[in-house]
């Protein structure tokens, strides 16, 4: 039972002598559970997970799992997405207060009104949204497939894109589209400073600047590579550059 609503999880002491990893593994077997962890999680959580990935990869794993219980170590909208894909399975989010500032920047009631103000538009939403926003959406995309989905529509198609204005601006720039953008953003990616990136580039002139498209356009424009979390990881492994200046979350590179 959740006794402290402010922290979103049961704050109980671990019994003395209990091996936490062994206990997690025992319960996982007994309950036929699968643990999915986002790249943003800390290393100890990633180590215990059955699968680690970005939003798209974890959604795909959730959709094909044979487990009865999905333990989703991610933010609230990710658990919702897993439940939508697997309505007959029990989906658990370890911390009920694990929120996403980007999803929070797009209240469903306000977004529905925004859609009404733009009749005749196809509504494309980034996966980082609540289930209520997805309910008024025609197509849900990830940063991995957003460009492909947008380009699948005829060029004269009127499109609303939400909630991330930075990702929307990036897609507009590389596709030549003029999508109508909802004015939302991730507070983490908003904090990256162009001035700081340029300062670090002077210190490490041989470093590659690699960026997630949720960053502001000035940072994207000076980047050597822009991509989803999975794409950034793959690029880092294959890159000939030894040093990378990364404008993204920290957990993905533990």
Feature names for model-found ranges:
Residues 2-81, 85, 94-124, 132-141, ...:
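Metallocofactor- and cofactor-centric catalytic cores in central/energy metabolism, strongly enriched
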Residues 41, 57-58, 77-78, 129-130, ...:
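Alpha-helix capping/helix-boundary segments
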Residues 45, 59, 78-81, 111, ...:
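Short, well-ordered alpha-helical microsegments
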Residues 72, 239-240, 252:
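Histidine/cysteine-enriched polar flanking segments
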Residues 89:
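Carbohydrate-active enzymes and regulators
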Residues 93-106, 124-127, 138-198:
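Conserved beta-alpha
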Residues 193-194, 198, 208-236, 246:
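Catalytic alpha/beta core domains of metabolic enzymes, predominantly
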Residues 243-250:
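Conserved small/polar residues in nucleotide/adenosyl-binding loops
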